[in-house]
Amino acid sequence: MRRQRRHNVPALAVAAVTSVGVAVVLALVYAPSYVNYDAQWALVWASDLWLGVTPEYTADFAPTPHPLATAVSSLALAFGHEAHLAILWLSLLSFGALVYLTYRLGEELFHPWVGVVAALVVLTRPAMERDALIGYQDMPFAVLVIGAVLLEARRPRRGVAVLALLAVAGLLRPEAWVLAGLYWLYLWPPAAPAERARTAALVLAAPLIWAASDWIVTGDPLHSLHGTAALAEEADRRRSPEQVPYWTAKYFGYALREPMMLGVPIGLGFAWLYGRRRAALPAAIVVAMTAVFAAGPLFGLPLIRRYVETPAVLLTLFYGLAVCGWMLLPAGRARSRWMAVGGLALALSVAYVPWHVTKLQNVDRRIEVDGRMYAHLQVAAEAPVVRAAFARCAPLTAADHRPIPFARFWLDGAPGSVTTVESGASPMGRMLLLPRRNRSTGRVYKKSTFPRVKPPDGFRQIYRNPSWRVFAAPGCSA
């Protein structure tokens, strides 16, 4: 027991150092300063709950509410208007944990160097870094799922511990419900009746909690399904079953980039020849999660790249096998051949480095430019003249949906106090928020999509900064 404890302490220390180290490096390199639209809405809903009002799940263009994201956002509210920074750090720490867990899973299933290569791939993917840098819940979700896979890899049919992690993950994304259900069926044959009942409770916990929260807030236990489908239609997102094959492949390519996608089939071939049993677990998870992604349009759900992020992380293990699988083989002709194949797979990735660096620089530019735009929005919402007018004349109308949760949070507004005229979602209020045309807003508001909304007659400008203007009706400002 003491030996086990001594072994666990260094492992936990390495995990903590890796998580914190990756988070600090990303923070220093990119200086992230804002969270994504969904995460900002979670902060708004958490604030509603703490104020004792019904969360505004049915607001104009509101995203899908994720129960765990809202619960965690409640803790971040202690930081006031800077609560988004707490969410950002949690996301960055989750990304660091994901890098570590990827290494541990590769080591457990195959070889330490397979884990090292896979972890380096995860660490350097522009799409994954970008999601971590703006606080998407897909980061902690991936950590929970990969953690569950690691527990199962260490001890097959582990049961409760794996299902517990999937239950928590199921409060962030519903794909975990399917994984939990399939795992429960896998546990069924040798399990006693009492164990089946106990594990079934864990399988059902997340979907029941999610449905209950939707029902309590909106009166519709399937609000998340209906709302997500409706928003996908409003935003004209990809949601046709005919688009599934193309965009599934495209999104995996976006997540891993081209050289990795060329290396993954090589790794799958190696696994088929030399490690089928060890590769079965991550391969099964990839297949199951990809199938859930592909089935989404049948229910009106959109095809979004982030939805394949967790299976993409698991595919990095097979790229690691392509590069380092030869280390698993005894000396001989096969080992030499696979060493050459691994060298080729690695060479393709190295040749792609200049393009890859450009993509990482694009992430940096996006974080910097969009961060400036949202910083200007916070300054506008906190300006005394704007807050005074808002107190007299709410609701504030935004030209489009993007500023809604940010403006509402920084204005300390009540449900319904910030709306949009986009697609006729709400009528014009007595205040209007408009973006300005400049470099800070140019990435989000391109020329073809810039809101074409004009202030109504009688409105006058009461505030402006480099990115935003605020107009108000007569009598709203001093």
Question: Where do the protein language model's features map onto the residues?
Answer:
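Signature aromatic-anchored transmembrane alpha helix within multi-pass, membrane-resident enzymes
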Residues: 15-18, 164, 201-208, 263-267, ...
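Short acidic/glycine- and proline-prone juxtamembrane loop motifs at membrane-interface regions
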Residues: 36, 127-140
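Membrane-lumen/periplasm interface segments of specific transmembrane helices
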Residues: 41, 180-181, 193-265, 347-362
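Transmembrane-helix motifs of polytopic, lipid-linked glycan transferases
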Residues: 89-109
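Membrane-embedded, lumen/periplasm-facing catalytic core of multi-pass transferases
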Residues: 345-405
